[in-house]
A protein has these predicted regions:
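Short, flexible helix-loop junctions that flank or precede catalytic/ligand sites
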Residues: 1-351
Length: 351
């Protein structure tokens, strides 16, 4: 059996994002988005059980035995922060470990566009970061909160499941609350946050109607609210939010959203030529024109508004991909696989 510390050391040296530990398979790392075996010796049930016992608390171990799964985060030997999911499959124990650096990367290190960083300086409003699981949303939001923490005097409350990046208060007071351990749900924590004198609120997942509604209310009442959604692209985010509500409420939500939404950032991570990954962003800054489109149910026009809004820092995903291909950061094949309109993208490249 390979001890867990050795596994984690090797994963960090290879810049792995995840470790998968499953009975009957060798340890598997995710490197630049691809799964790669670490060694050839398959793990046994005794191995994976020992890994779980090294990481988990007694309370969560009880939950795992009762429910067949448990989700938590842990700082391991001052090496790394990990988001851990332990689960049963075919009656055996498996682990999925997401590796998170202890040091929060700066906005500059992540390559966040200036217009995205500028959202952290807004006094109020709703800022959304969207994308699939593993697209770097948590890193982006951590960098934005870190920017606020080192430049402004504000009270930040985060609601996360679990807490991923740990923030040490600098200029700000930061309270990080974990769903399950510190509050019952995102919606409950968000309702409570409104009574805790916050300036900035981070909602780790806007996954249900009540959480979305309360987040919009928090932005309406003068707070800067950051949230995430699993939508693809900034433009699709508006329809996703409005469609979450019953038909009789949609017009009111449309009015509220048009009033409070400041920016939506869609992002994904793609493999670079020569190794490593890079973030690609679609950015919608909510101008008066886009507010009008939201109010008038003309969200189908938003893509055109983004395309012509470069002076505001806006960009479509496909335009960002084209720039990366031109600069030889990613391959054309990678760009085509990620493009929203691959046929149009390919035709544009040929002409």
């Amino acid at each position: 059996m390979i001890d867990l510390e050795t596994l984690i050391h090797d994963a960090l040296e290879r810049n792995a994002s995840d470790i998968h530990l499953t009975v009957g398979e060798p340890p598997i790392f995710r490197l630049d988005g691809e799964l790669t075996n670490f060694g050839e010796v398959p793990l046994t049930e005794a191995d994976t059980t020992a890994y779980v016992q090294e990481l988990i608390t007694p309370g969560l171990l009880k939950e795992f035995h009762e429910m067949g799964e448990a989700d938590f985060a842990v700082t391991y030997h001052d090496l790394v922060r990990m988001r851990c999911n332990v689960f049963r499959q075919r009656g055996m124990t498996s682990l999925a470990l997401r590796l998170l650096p202890l040091r929060i990367a700066t906005a500059e290190e992540l390559g966040l566009p200036p217009v995205v960083v500028a959202q952290a300086d807004k006094p109020r409003g709703l800022v959304l970061v969207t994308g699939p699981t593993g697209s770097g949303k948590s890193s982006t939001l951590a960098a934005l909160l870190d920017h606020i923490n080192h430049s402004q005097r504000r009270h930040i409350i985060t609601l996360e499941e679990p807490i991923e990046y740990l923030h040490a208060s600098d200029q700000c007071i930061i309270n990080q609350r974990e769903v399950g351990a510190d509050t019952g749900s995102f919606a409950a924590g968000l309702r409570a946050a409104l009574r805790q004198d916050p300036d900035v609120i981070l909602v780790g997942e806007m996954r249900d109607l009540e959480t979305i509604s309360t987040a919009i209310t928090a932005a309406e009442t003068g707070h800067l609210v950051f949230g995430t959604l699993h939508t693809k692209g900034a433009a699709n985010t508006i329809d996703r939010i409005i469609d979450s509500f019953p038909a009789e409420q949609q017009n009111q939500i449309r009015i509220q959203l048009a009033d409070v939404l400041e920016c939506a950032v869609g992002q994904t991570l793609l493999p670079k030529i020569g190794g490593g990954r890079t973030a690609v962003f679609e950015i919608m800054v909510v101008t008066p024109a886009i507010r009008s489109m939201i109010l008038q149910s003309k969200t189908f026009q938003i893509v055109s508004a983004i395309q012509t809004g470069k002076r505001y820092g806006m960009q479509l995903l496909d335009d960002a991909l084209e720039d990366l291909v031109d600069r030889h950061v990613i391959s054309l094949e990678t760009a085509l696989a990620a493009a929203n309109e691959p046929d149009k993208f390919k035709t544009g490249r040929q002409t």
